[in-house]
UniProtKB/Swiss-Prot annotation:
Residues 684-826 are cytoplasmic. It comes from Mus musculus. GO terms for molecular function: calcium ion binding; cell adhesion molecule binding; immunoglobulin receptor binding; integrin binding; metalloendopeptidase activity; metallopeptidase activity; tumor necrosis factor receptor superfamily binding; zinc ion binding. Residues 17-658 are extracellular. This is Disintegrin and metalloproteinase domain-containing protein 8.
């Protein structure tokens, strides 16, 4: 706090002393100060470039000092990120950049709960940060990160008042909008959703290139835009990852000032040139062309994961946050969101004066920053559709540009969880500093994770949405719900047959395209075909319900061409696929055309085309076949063939997992017992080993007589006679030795010359084999010269009669005294 106070005292920024900015009404000049910070725990090595993993800046304004804590958005660029541009000779170049560094950061403002920041640091600081309901923008006045910067609120930004070109009548896939806010929420609304991902491909046209002046400037602009869009969608558990960028200095299709024409041309170009060439989920055009009227963007509704997944965006603001807000809005349409104004009773917690919500129809001087509750309900309804599977494809997190980083909300190599930065993390199961589970936790996220524990097997984690969907159950081992599965193709459903998780019918397709009052046209309409341009009609003589889709009633869609003609039984309407009528909407694949038949490749074919007959027979009446022709077991039964109950499988798994533990326990007990037994044996043998080392060994020949060895004998210790200075045991009977032919040396005068009587054992000593006498005469024994301070050697005892045993240990200068050996019974 003292540091911040000092900064506020030292910094007294002047108001608008710099050069005038044509796009800003008023601003303050600030000098950001980069704060010293310790290197991130998992910061990348220096070869990754000049932009560190985390940064902190202090921004002093009139009356406030804001401290921004930023972390590099390492997930901004996907592993397959490419850039395509035109070379000087006109040839097209595509580069897949490796170890691509960038300067895009996200973060928060210290001391402000719920704050957010999206900043570029390439040439000074450029971006925004939000404190409460106020959005602050910052841009450099020179290229120094600590030089002069213009800082202003969003309300002071001068820009074109923009609107979205999407009209309510174009919300074909969403049905009627009236009172939708009161409709029942999806059944799985309360089930936590896992993170979904939009792999984004961006195209910048020639007008945008000319406007910004260089390829690098366009690239930096696009990265700033996507970085901001990603930040906005994190609120909805979505991540936006840029996988491709094209920069044109010459347009590849006609870009009209009419947004709808440009959108149709753009999507046609995508289908012909981009689809299948570079994997992506959504494509966005950023154009420098000024669209007619107030329109700044247009998109297809509920089109993500389809061939219509895309939008066009006019770069209408000097600040990149402007076009980013437009792109976030149009991407919302692709994700099934409608305008907040089109839903009666829709509530946005942010007032319009403060920017409103992202899906408001018009963009004012303040940029929106949150989604309304209506948008969240629309999104939840859209993602439950089976055709949105592309959103669940997790990008290869181990190949993100920049490598794994703790705190980016992606669980990467070496991490058990990732709940964001320590300031943002609200997950009690995850340590945000280490990205490891807290002690005692089994999981931190996932629909099969509850209070840090994996849910038991058999609990529902994803409800079925309709007759063509299947509910999924937790397996008791993983915190994530199994892959979304649905009924096998050809399963009967209301009015038709299931196909890829949906139940396509002619009636539903007419309502989707022409509104709730539409219905299927008479059969006579389906006996005609329409040539391109709706120039007449051709009678085929037979009914074909698998060609062009003919409807009647409903509302005529705006900005869509259509063809109308009369038949014997009514009016036939055919809807064009775009603003022209060269092609028409066709009946969808899998639509029921006759009893037991479906549309496939433009013709009415038997259900056997699905090759799914008798598939469920292998599921033992406890499950059905899914779209992968695998058994999807009923609740309580275990895959793969639904023969065993989950409880039995769990018991077997528990037994199999406990078997190694029991084996280890038994081994530990056995080892412990062996150690104890070995200890007892060693303990009992220890005195004997000491005694053996203390007494003379049993002689095997006359040469073993200890008197024949000098003190420097090289015999091993266990065969060497006892040293006179060693302690000799008195607890064992004397062992017989060979009787020497010469008398022992005379003892010192202090000791009596008459030997002490030696007791005889009462029991008979066992027969012992006497060693043979030496074959050669023994050498003359010379007595050793002993210093007065040492005791003389003990005289030997006759074998077989028992004898004296040397006394206890003698001290220096103390004579040895023969002791009586205690009588022991054998």
């Amino acid at each position: 706090m003292l540091g911040l106070w000092l900064l506020s005292v030292l910094w007294t920024p002047a108001v608008a002393p710099g050069p005038p900015l044509p796009h800003v009404k008023q601003y303050e000049v600030v000098w950001p100060r980069r704060l010293a910070a310790s290197r991130s725990r998992r910061a990348l090595p220096s070869h990754w470039g000049q932009y560190p993993e985390s940064l902190s800046y202090a921004l002093g304004t009139s009356g406030h000092v804001f401290t921004l804590h930023l972390r590099k958005n390492r997930d901004l660029l996907g592993s397959s990120y490419t850039e395509t541009y035109s070379a000087a000779n006109g040839s097209e170049v595509t580069e897949q950049l490796q170890e691509q560094d960038h300067c895009l950061y996200q973060g928060h403002v210290e001391g402000y709960e719920g704050s957010a920041a999206s900043i570029s640091t390439c040439a000074g600081l450029r971006g925004f940060f939000r404190v409460g309901s106020t959005v602050h923008l910052i841009e450099p006045l020179d290229a120094d990160e600590e030089g002069q910067h213009a800082m202003y609120q969003a309300k002071h930004l001068q820009q074109k008042a923009g609107t979205c070109g999407v009209k309510d009548t174009n919300l074909n896939d969403l049905g009627p909008r009236a009172l939708e806010i009161y409709r029942a929420q999806p059944r799985n609304w309360l089930i936590p959703r896992e993170t979904r991902y939009v792999e984004l491909y961006v195209v910048a046209d020639s007008q945008e290139f000319q406007k910004l002046g260089s390829r690098e400037a366009v690239r930096q602009r696009v990265l700033e835009v996507v970085n901001h869009v990603d930040k906005l969608y994190q609120e909805l558990s979505f991540r936006v990852v840029l996988v491709g960028l094209e920069i044109w200095n010459k347009d590849k299709f006609y870009i009209s000032r009419y947004a709808n024409v440009t959108l149709e041309n753009f999507l046609s170009w995508r289908e012909q040139n981009l689809q299948g060439q570079h994997p992506h989920d959504n494509v966005q055009l950023i154009t420098g062309v000024d669209f007619i009227g107030s329109t700044v963007g247009l998109a297809k509704v509920s089109a993500l994961c389809s061939r219509h997944s895309g939008a066009v965006n006019q770069d209408h603001s000097k600040n990149s946050i402007g076009v980013a807000s437009t792109m976030a809005h149009e991407l919302g349409h692709n994700l099934g969101m409608s305008h907040d104004e089109d839903i009666p009773g829709c509530y946005c917690p942010e007032p319009r004066e403060g920017g409103g919500c992202i899906m408001t129809e018009s963009i004012g001087s303040k940029f929106p920053r949150i989604f309304s509750r209506c948008s969240k309900i629309d999104l939840e309804s859209f993602v439950t559709k089976p055709q949105t599977g592309c959103l669940t494809n997790v990008p290869d997190v181990n190949r993100f540009v920049g490598g794994p980083v703790c705190g980016n909300l992606f669980v990467e190599h070496g991490e058990q969880c990732d709940c964001g930065t320590p300031q943002d993390c609200q997950n009690p199961c995850c340590n945000a500093t280490t990205c490891q589970l807290v002690k005692g936790a089994e999981c931190a996220s996932g629909t099969c994770c509850h209070e840090c524990k994996v849910k038991p097997a058999g609990e529902v984690c994803r409800l079925s949405k309709d007759k063509c969907d299947l509910e999924e159950f937790c397996d008791g081992r993983k915190p994530t719900c199994p892959e979304d599965a649905f009924q096998q193709n050809g399963t009967p459903c209301p009015g038709g047959y299931c196909f890829d998780g949906s139940c396509p019918t002619l009636a539903q397709q007419c309502r989707d395209l022409w509104g709730p009052g539409a219905r299927v046209a008479a059969d006579s309409c389906y006996t005609f075909s329409i040539p391109p341009g709706c120039n007449g009609r051709m009678y085929s003589g037979r009914i074909n319900r698998c060609g062009a889709l003919y409807c009647e009633g409903g509302q005529k869609p705006l900005e869509r061409s259509f063809c109308t003609f009369s038949s014997n039984h009514g009016v036939c309407h055919a809807l064009g696929t775009g603003s022209n009528i060269d092609t028409f909407e066709l009946v969808l694949q899998g639509t029921k055309c006759e009893e037991g038949k479906v549309c496939m490749d433009g013709s009415c074919q038997d259900l056997r085309v699905y090759r799914s007959e008798n598939c469920s027979a292998k599921c033992n009446n406890h499950g059905v076949c899914n779209h992968k022709r695998e058994c999807h077991c009923h609740k309580g039964w275990a895959p793969p063939n639904c023969v065993q109950r989950l409880a039995d499988v769990s018991d077997e798994q528990a037994a199999s997992t406990s078997l190694p533990v029991s084996v280890v326990v038994v081994l530990v007990i056995l080892v412990a017992a062996m150690v104890i037994v070995a200890g007892i044996v060693i303990y009992r043998k220890a005195p004997r080993q000491i005694q053996r080392r203390s007494v003379a060994p049993k002689p095997i020949s006359g040469l073993s007589n200890p008197l024949f060895y000098t003190r420097d004998s090289s015999l091993p210790a266990k065969n060497r006679p006892p040293d006179p200075s060693e302690t000799v045991s008195t607890n064992q009977p004397p062992r017989p030795i060979v009787k020497p032919k010469r008398p022992p040396p005379a003892p010192p005068g202090a000791v009596s010359s008459s030997p002490l009587p030696v007791p005889v054992y009462a029991p008979k000593i066992p027969n012992q084999f006497r060693p043979d006498p030496p074959t050669k005469p023994l050498p003359e024994l010379k007595p050793k010269q002993v210093k007065p301070t040492f005791a003389p050697p003990t005289p030997p005892v006759k074998p077989g009669t028992g004898g004296t045993v040397p006394g206890a240990t003698q001290g220096a200068g103390e004579p040895k005294v023969a002791l009586k050996v205690p009588i022991q019974k054998r």
